[in-house]
């Protein structure tokens, strides 16, 4: 059985994407592994998520096609926002894939619970990026993963170009397998 994380990078490669700018982390461990396994991708590790997002923006400007930013949950996704904002304002295509804590420890699973954070290193990144991306979704149903990836690539590369965050595609850790 194909893991959702493997499917994501396989479909991105099928769409012609070949470069990823990465900061690894526990909240994206299966995404990190899937990227390593996909032979059509070249990836560069960075020390900070902002640098990874800005490197992806620079790559897209030079290559004329989007790159992938892959970061971990919570602060990882938040740290990438300066680069996502830059891509948004300059209409630069970018696909951001971030990890997320287990669905059971996401605030979105408990709408009546009035706390700011539930899971360790959790952030509601989708709400944060919705205004600066063309598409933002959390893959909570593995059967819909392929559709999310296709939509993210389509929106990032057609019409007025811009970042998508699954594009932020977030993938809860327990949905990555």
Q: How does the language model describe each region?
A:
Residues 168-177:
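Single conserved hydrophobic/aromatic residue that forms the stacking wall/gate
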């Amino acid at each position: 059985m194909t893991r959702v994380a493997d499917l994501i990078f396989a479909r991105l490669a099928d769409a012609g994407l070949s470069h990823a700018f990465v900061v690894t982390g526990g909240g994206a461990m299966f995404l990190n592994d899937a990227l390593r396994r996909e032979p059509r991708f070249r990836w560069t590790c960075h020390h900070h998520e902002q640098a990874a997002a800005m490197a992806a923006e620079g790559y897209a400007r030079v290559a004329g096609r989007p790159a992938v930013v892959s970061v971990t949950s919570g602060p990882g996704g938040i740290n990438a926002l300066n680069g996502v904002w830059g891509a948004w304002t300059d209409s630069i295509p970018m696909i951001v894939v971030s990890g997320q804590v287990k669905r059971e420890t996401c605030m979105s699973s408990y709408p009546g619970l009035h706390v700011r954070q539930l899971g360790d290193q959790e952030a509601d990144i989708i709400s944060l990026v919705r205004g600066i991306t063309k598409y933002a979704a959390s893959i909570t149903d593995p059967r819909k993963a392929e559709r999310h990836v296709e939509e993210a690539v389509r929106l990032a590369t057609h019409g007025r170009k811009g970042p998508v965050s699954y594009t932020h595609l977030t993938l809860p850790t327990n949905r990555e397998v």
